[in-house]
Amino acid sequence: MSGSVAAGAAAGPVPPAQEEGMTWWYRWLCRLAGVLGAVSCAISGLFNCVTIHPLNIAAGVWMIMNAFILLLCEAPFCCQFVEFANTVAEKVDRLRSWQKAVFYCGMAIVPIVMSLTLTTLLGNAIAFATGVLYGLSALGKKGDAISYARIQQQRQQADEEKLAETFEGEL
């Protein structure tokens, strides 16, 4: 009895990323974009903090915080000095792709709203792109071009038949 319970617990529910049909290479692409976004946010945030303008400093601190959160969520092995790093990463992995997209894009927009400079734009571009990648995965895979063309052709034939019936009815 305990063996079957342990086996059921080990299998557990399928993570949402796999439910949505996210391929392994796309998942790694999103993670890589998250890590690169964290690095760009951290470096740009440090440059932003070297100023006397208070909004630039606030945006720089926010960007450094974004970098830490991105690393914590996407690459918890980089944050092993934080005791709860793996717990946070597991909880983030259970989120749906659209939730990650909103979270990452929202985090990247805040410093740009605080201080619209080239440093904040370039620093948050990759972090925002990470959110966009997760958003695209939330949209899912659409049909291929051949099936789309076939559907369009069927619609066009149906429209032509309706038009022909309309003209025959007028005569």
UniProtKB/Swiss-Prot annotation:
<comment type="similarity">
    <text>Belongs to the calcium channel flower family.</text>
</comment>
<dbReference type="Pfam" id="PF10233">
    <property type="entry name" value="Cg6151-P"/>
</dbReference>
<dbReference type="InterPro" id="IPR019365">
    <property type="entry name" value="TVP18/Ca-channel_flower"/>
</dbReference>
<keyword id="KW-1003">Cell membrane</keyword>
<dbReference type="GO" id="GO:0005886">
    <property type="term" value="C:plasma membrane"/>
</dbReference>
<feature type="transmembrane region" description="Helical">
    <location>
        <begin position="102"/>
        <end position="122"/>
    </location>
</feature>
<keyword id="KW-0472">Membrane</keyword>
<comment type="subunit">
    <text>Interacts with adaptor protein complex 2 (AP-2).</text>
</comment>
<dbReference type="GO" id="GO:0016192">
    <property type="term" value="P:vesicle-mediated transport"/>
</dbReference>
<feature type="transmembrane region" description="Helical">
    <location>
        <begin position="125"/>
        <end position="141"/>
    </location>
</feature>
<feature type="topological domain" description="Extracellular">
    <location>
        <begin position="123"/>
        <end position="124"/>
    </location>
</feature>
<feature type="topological domain" description="Cytoplasmic">
    <location>
        <begin position="142"/>
        <end position="171"/>
    </location>
</feature>
<feature type="transmembrane region" description="Helical">
    <location>
        <begin position="57"/>
        <end position="77"/>
    </location>
</feature>
<keyword id="KW-0770">Synapse</keyword>
<keyword id="KW-1133">Transmembrane helix</keyword>
<feature type="topological domain" description="Cytoplasmic">
    <location>
        <begin position="78"/>
        <end position="101"/>
    </location>
</feature>
<keyword id="KW-0812">Transmembrane</keyword>
<protein>
    <recommendedName>
        <fullName>Calcium channel flower homolog</fullName>
    </recommendedName>
</protein>
<keyword id="KW-0333">Golgi apparatus</keyword>
<keyword id="KW-0968">Cytoplasmic vesicle</keyword>
<comment type="function">
    <text>Transmembrane protein which mediates synaptic endocytosis and fitness-based cell culling. In response to different stimulus strengths, controls two major modes of synaptic vesicle (SV) retrieval in hippocampal neurons; Clathrin-mediated endocytosis (CME) in response to mild stimulation and activity-dependent bulk endocytosis (ADBE) in response to strong stimulation. In cytotoxic T-lymphoocytes (CTLs) facilitates calcium-dependent endocytosis of cytotoxic granules (CGs) at the immuno synapse.</text>
</comment>
<feature type="topological domain" description="Extracellular">
    <location>
        <begin position="53"/>
        <end position="56"/>
    </location>
</feature>
<feature type="transmembrane region" description="Helical">
    <location>
        <begin position="32"/>
        <end position="52"/>
    </location>
</feature>
<dbReference type="GO" id="GO:0008021">
    <property type="term" value="C:synaptic vesicle"/>
</dbReference>
<dbReference type="GO" id="GO:0005794">
    <property type="term" value="C:Golgi apparatus"/>
</dbReference>
<feature type="topological domain" description="Cytoplasmic">
    <location>
        <begin position="1"/>
        <end position="31"/>
    </location>
</feature>
